[in-house]
UniProtKB/Swiss-Prot annotation:
The keyword Flavoprotein does not apply. It is found in: Plastid, Chloroplast thylakoid membrane. It is an enzyme of class 7 (translocase). GO terms for biological process: ATP synthesis coupled electron transport; electron transport coupled proton transport. It comes from the Eukaryota. It comes from Psilotum nudum. The lineage of its organism: Eukaryota, Viridiplantae, Streptophyta, Embryophyta, Tracheophyta. The chain crosses the membrane at residues 4-24, 37-57, 87-107, 111-131, 134-154, 167-187, 207-227, 242-262, 274-294, 305-325, 331-351, 386-406, 417-437, 461-481. This is NAD(P)H-quinone oxidoreductase chain 4, chloroplastic. GO terms for molecular function: NADH dehydrogenase (ubiquinone) activity; ubiquinone binding.
């Protein structure tokens, strides 16, 4: 069993299964829905089995290695492997994608193509987190682009073509920098050409070259994460995408940028990361406060949640740039936590739109009476997003701030300024989230019509509860997931502290 190519099976299974969708009998959409849900559930079970039976938590090195020579003259290998950092994000991908497929049940137009794209996206996301070859990393990064663009342009709102084109231009522009950086890193050096991440870990560069490489990769990640000022595609995309697509965008796609920042910039380019860290910490703090202010002023629910995502990604930037094990652990935990909370909020925003046919807060009000279950779930996830103690985001944000405080390289004045700016965002978060709840669920704006609204059904309650459980579990017992990547974080930071 241990000799099986587990990771290749995990990466290729959803994509391979998607090609059987056109062969399914044309008996309505039910067959395609259940087939896709079954494939995603089997994939998640395969990931869980691999994690439980083949993966060793105490080993920070790359495990389950697979290396196949794919394109010889390009030194392009199908090179896969996982450690605690990537395994946590792969588990998140499997969990969120399975629930997103279930959330997409109301989709009725071009269902076969829709689910084909969802499965292709599934494979691309897992392939990126499992890649141990920087060209394969780039290939998986680009593989995401096509399904997301089509999902946006075909199943989005009224401005779907504008938002999908904007997403395409931003992401493709960032990908150019990723490709240039990947090729330069692989071709540079006297030890021969190699794109293997494990070999590149031991390769050193002149500081000018390392800085240029770092900046090139940073531009690509700044688009996906996103980092100001490369964030403007995000509100447009989330505002127009179907809520099942939003679950994948907020839950997984944004985490690709944070993962790349740790896996490549922090691990392979430590000297440049040390130089860029004060700037990134400053940008992260400004992003938290700026996005919180913008979110408070927006009347559109999905755009407000989108800007809250930008704000929460600011914490990830600060944690990664704190250059401490506490802060980096907090950043990874924040990625997992936001992946769950962001997916849940967009799901609930989407199903509230299905019932009220509006996303604008000034057109809502009083719907807590006919839809108490929706109100309860929205309240839980809003409290989780504002980092209520006992929720996963509270632990993540606390660790990130503690990481900044314990950094031995930053001055006391710098730490105080960062904490002050970050605190502004922390204070604004409950203001814009609780005001959103008040405007949606209280008052009498549409109370008379709301008597005919249908509350959450069993499928929607199932999705909401299953996302809420890990948020509470991690909040109560953080070591449930911190033990996954703690050893890996310590091994990365040895480069900085020896």
């Amino acid at each position: 069993m241990s000799n099986l190519p587990w990771l290749t099976l995990i990466v290729l299974f959803p994509f391979s299964a998607s090609f059987l969708i056109p062969l399914l009998p044309y008996k309505g959409n039910k067959v395609v829905r259940w087939y896709t849900l079954g494939i995603c559930a089997l994939e998640f079970l395969l990931i869980t089995f691999t994690f439980c039976c083949q993966f060793h938590l105490s080993d920070p090195s790359i495990q389950l290695k697979e290396d196949y020579n794919w394109i010889s003259f390009l030194y392009f290998h199908w090179n896969l492997g996982v450690d605690g950092l990537s395994m946590g994000l792969i588990l998140l991908t499997g969990f969120i994608t399975t629930l997103a497929i279930l959330a997409a049940w109301p989709v009725t137009r071009n269902v076969r193509l829709f689910y084909f794209l969802m499965l292709a996206m599934y494979s691309g996301q897992i392939g990126l987190f499992a890649s141990q070859n920087i060209l394969l990393f780039f290939f998986m990064w680009e593989l995401e682009l096509i399904p997301v663009y089509l999902l946006l342009s075909m199943w989005g709102g009224k401005k779907r073509l504008y938002s999908s084109t904007k997403f395409l231009l931003y992401t493709a522009g960032g990908s150019i920098f990723l490709l240039v950086g990947s090729l330069t890193m692989g071709l540079y050096g006297s030890n021969g050409t190699s794109f293997d991440l494990q070999i590149l870990t031991n390769r050193s560069y002149p500081i000018a070259v390392e800085t240029a490489l770092y900046f090139s990769f940073l531009i690509a990640y700044a688009v996906k994460l996103p980092i100001l000022p490369f964030h403007t595609w995000l509100p447009d995309t989330h505002g127009e995408a179907h809520y099942s697509t939003c679950m994948l965008l907020a839950g997984i796609l944004l985490k690709m940028g944070g993962y790349g920042l740790i896996r490549i910039n922090m691990e392979l380019l430590p000297h440049a990361h040390f130089l860029f860290s004060p700037l990134l910490v400053t940008m992260g703090a400004v992003q938290i406060a700026y996005a919180s202010l913008i979110s408070f002023s927006l009347p559109n629910i999905k755009r407000r949640i989108a800007y809250s995502s930008v704000s929460h990604m600011g914490f990830v930037i600060i944690g990664i740039s704190s250059i401490t094990d506490i802060g980096t652990n907090g950043a990874i935990l924040q990625m997992i936590s936001h992946g769950l909370i962001g997916a849940a909020l967009f799901f609930l925003a989407g199903i509230s739109y299905d019932r009220t046919q509006t996303l604008y807060l000034d057109q809502l009000g009083g719907i807590a009476v006919p839809m108490p279950r929706l109100f309860t779930m929205f309240s839980f996830f809003s409290l989780a997003s504002l980092a209520l103690p006992g929720m996963s985001s509270f632990v993540a944000e606390f660790l990130i701030f503690l990481g900044i405080v314990t950094n031995p390289y930053y001055s006391l004045i710098f730490k105080s300024i960062i904490l002050f700016i970050g605190a502004i965002g922390v204070i604004l978060t409950p203001i814009y989230l609780l005001s959103m709840l008040r405007k949606m669920f209280y008052g009498f704006k549409i109370y008379q019509n709301s008597l005919f609204f249908i509350d959450l059904g069993p499928r929607e309650i199932f999705i909401s509860v299953f996302i809420l459980l890990p948020i509470l579990g991690i909040g109560i017992y953080p070591n449930l997931v911190l033990s996954l990547w703690n050893e890996k974080v310590e091994s990365i930071l040895l480069q900085y502290y020896g």
